[in-house]
Amino acid sequence: KSEIYEVRHYKDRLIVEVVSRNDDSSFRKLFKYISGKNNKSQEIKMTVPVTQGEKDNGYYMQFYLPSKFTKENAPIPTNSDVKISIIEEGFFAVIEYSGRASDNNFFKHKEILNKKLLEDKVIIKGPPIRATYNGPFTLPMMRRNEAMFKVEWSK
């Protein structure tokens, strides 16, 4: 852990995601899935963080599924835009910040993290990821947000 960032190891994680040209409807589609718009009409507890980033010339938004689910037993989305996938385990360099989860706030902290990783000669293995932990009614100064990169790291 540096004074700017920490490196975390995450095991494989099951997610539900939407990839689109603009992310305006992504949250709504994911929320409908966990609210029962799936083949089992099953409601699923929302987990945090919600992650976002760039993928396939578009943008993705992801919800993590609770650990009781596997790719085999997770309810199948009824909306074809909603996909179930696995994020493979790996190491992630993370910088935390408060305030609004705005593009400007994310880009500012992503750049701080990117610069420090380059200074520390840490190899970045993917595009930046935005993680948000709080709903819109949480006061900005109380919000927890993160910018992260998948990195090459040894334990």
Model-derived features with residue positions:
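A solvent-exposed interaction/effector surface
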Residues: 1-155
